[in-house]
């Protein structure tokens, strides 16, 4: 048996390459390459296309007559070729058969056919007619001359006639010449021989384009390819989106698994909503219903707490979170929270135990506040207190990151010293009555001042002591014992009482009207509010100058001027603010706003000079010499202003005292009435204070801190003293790191205690309480507030002595740049201008600028009441006896100041701002 491989026996796996052989074993040539095939196809298609252009369609119509006389038509289609000897035109006519020899007859006597016939000529073999009389082309010409519209030649027996016809292409005939052969020629000759009547119609049709179907194929192929590409791209995009969606869904599921779920408990109100910690239940805070299904929370229901502290039913919010990955309320993305510190929560359930401090701020009232600079936003949270009132919590967990907001914080904010908080809430229990906020009057604006005050013995959350606050920055509270080298702790801080760990940010500067309680000649420095107080408000006014219901008869009164100003001029000052506290009685729901004019301050003749400075700081002060302040820089700024309260007969104020009477513009004092004029500086207490009523608590014995009745600073502020001293070593008021500085006569008196940083806007209340012996003509609610603003970002033009530069001003509205130079005309500096006139001016407290001041000098009285010139010597002696502990030199300087302002200040008695 032969091997299948066909090879040698020793190589069975080897195969032979068989050659292609023909039937007899000859080798076949390899197949032609593809370009060669394409060339052949084009070459073959070329002549075919040329022949297609020469094709002539001959339509023969036969007319057969019937016995009835009707004609029956039969159409036969034939195909021929146009000869180059004639034109390629369409022709039609009756078919006439002609013999070739008949065309050779030149006898003109023969009848000529009418024009419009088609001649059909059958050519014979060349052997039968070796010497023709005319050529084929000549015969065609003879037929056209005799009136033929077209000539058809049958060349089946004489194919050479085609070449003879093509030779006449130089001078072609104007009528078509067509030749037929083969089967078409046989059909034509049969019709001509058998039929008597027939018509021929020759048509020249345009040849079909060979690329017609080819172009359609290209278009279809291109369309299919583009469709496939688009389909592939769509599929890829869809798959990518599905993968991304699956990834996002996985991340959402992971984030959802990490979120906490708690059970709702409506009984425990002490816990704040969204607080961090291992709490299994949520209390009923300000929101007790689900924002998705709008149903109330039921005890025991499982709630989902989103990192943005919003809570919803778990069954309601989970599908939304899985699909949209954002909080339905605030659009907080639950997936993109990686790398962010997130919301910092503070557990406030144990605040009463003193574990963690908290800053409680009231809810904002409606209004527009103009900031003087951009303040970075710090996290706040609105919660409910124990009485069900919403409060704003400023919370920020430090965790050792002291520079958390330092890149975004302005320079003046970073310059504030940290708070030193070393007392807690736990030791002191406020025994005063806390009045809960009445839900019947939500967000009702107060009757007087920019914040409401409580008639009860203590403050509620809406009527708290933080009646008007303005953040200048935030600093971290330091533990007790930590000291900043640049700032020496001076005195007891009267800021927010912390407890335990210092993990919260506290405001370093807050504008607060200090608590005052006037009870017929007695003054309590830290009692709760019982009346209307004027505070620095940043709200825009409601044009109180147009009040027509008050007894001032449409005229406004500026506290620092004895002249009457028309209200139309004052009302235009609403956008700038002013020192005036004119009360509009049109509605009890709007604030009396603070105004400020744009003109320079005018020191009226006869008004007393500015309050005297200690002898070590000024040589001319204290001797009754006229005071001239330095020139003021440009800009619409607020200088030292004296703010006063004003009653009107129609204003909706609280009930006055039984012995009070209505006056047109101010306070009426009966002649000869002895006034107990006191000037109280509201500052820090002698010890830790209550968080709600700020009632001072005594320091523990042995603490090494001594206080006096003068009080201390209420809030911390920037460092006010810089090294801007003359060669004599006398310290002077210089620039500070904060935005605002404090005029020297706003420093509180603290005997035995070192000074602490002071707030930018300190409040001085000048109380006029009627003596106990005479009980008519004095309002217990009337008072005056003196506010001093000082620009401390920029250093003064020169180092002036102490607080002499009263014209240093700050911009209240940043956009107001086209203001006048100088101080406002309706504002007085601290020029000993009493709200009741020049005779009731007060003396500045003696300030001690160096730390080496003796104890006796520090224990000098802070204030001394000026004696009214119209009072009797007995009354004057009685008033001076109350402050007999003052040093003799200070009393003498005050007496000189009173004498210097004697006649000019007399008419101010009996008038109010």
From Swiss-Prot:
Biased composition of type Gly residues is found at: 903-913
Q: So which stretches are on the Extracellular side?
A: 53-216
Where it sits in the cell: the answer is: Cell membrane
Give residue spans, biased composition: Polar residues.
634-664, 881-890
> What GO MF annotations does this protein's record show?
frizzled binding; ubiquitin-protein transferase activity; zinc ion binding
Per its UniProt entry, which superkingdom is the organism in?
Eukaryota
* Region described as Disordered: 1-32, 601-669, 855-913
**Activity control:** Negatively regulated by R-spondin proteins such as RSPO1: interaction with RSPO1 induces the indirect association between ZNRF3 and LGR4, promoting membrane clearance of ZNRF3.
The membrane topology term of the UniProt record is: Single-pass type I membrane protein
Topology check: give the Cytoplasmic ranges: 238-913
The Gene Ontology biological process terms listed for this entry are: limb development; negative regulation of canonical Wnt signaling pathway; negative regulation of non-canonical Wnt signaling pathway; negative regulation of Wnt signaling pathway; protein ubiquitination; regulation of canonical Wnt signaling pathway; regulation of Wnt signaling pathway, planar cell polarity pathway; stem cell proliferation
Q: Which reaction does it catalyse?
A: S-ubiquitinyl-[E2 ubiquitin-conjugating enzyme]-L-cysteine + [acceptor protein]-L-lysine = [E2 ubiquitin-conjugating enzyme]-L-cysteine + N(6)-ubiquitinyl-[acceptor protein]-L-lysine
Top EC class, one word: transferase
Its Gene Ontology cellular component terms are: plasma membrane
Name the SUPFAM superfamilies on file: RING/U-box
- Residue intervals of every RING-type zinc finger in the record: 290-331
- Give TM segment ranges: 217-237
Q: Does the keyword Iron apply?
A: no
Tell me the protein's name.
E3 ubiquitin-protein ligase ZNRF3
Q: Which organism is it from?
A: Mus musculus (Mouse)
Please spell out the taxonomic lineage of the organism that makes this protein.
Answer: Eukaryota, Metazoa, Chordata, Craniata, Vertebrata
